[in-house]
Amino acid sequence: MKFLVDTSVFLWALSEEYKLNPAAQEILKSSTSELYFSAVGSWEIAFKFALGSLPLPKAPSEYISHALRVWALRALDITHEHALRAGELPVHHRDPFDRMLIAQALSEEMTLLTADRVFQKYKVDLIFCGK
């Protein structure tokens, strides 16, 4: 099964795994899970790091590259199809990072791993990963 890991789940898996529920931990550790991390997550992390609102032990480029290898995450680039799909989503909230993740999950037929309850307002397959 293909899973798209949202930014908060990605960060929790790296440094605060206790925040993830057991089902999420099992999916992330399973050798049969196809795990993807979007370029939008990298953008969000780099942006928040630059603003000073997300402390990291090293630069985002190093941190993310290391995490992709450790967790065997596949990179998911942003396409024009994703961008257009994000623009077509109902406006349940205005976070552009979240909207892009939802659009990508829909376009690529992936299940979104998230800890953000607002995602439930959209018609996207998801698994809630928080406790």
Enumerate the predicted regions with their spans.
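Short, well-structured N-terminal submotif of metal-dependent ribonuclease cores
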Residues: 1-38, 51-66, 108, 117, ...
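Phosphate- and divalent-cation-binding pockets in alpha/beta enzyme and binding domains
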Residues: 44, 85-88, 121-122
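Active-site neighborhoods of divalent-metal-dependent phosphate/nucleic-acid chemistry enzymes
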Residues: 55-61, 65, 69-115, 129
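Generic structural signal for small/hydrophobic residues in well-ordered secondary structure
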Residues: 7-8, 45, 86, 105
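Alpha-helix capping/helix-boundary segments
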Residues: 9, 41-42, 82, 101, ...
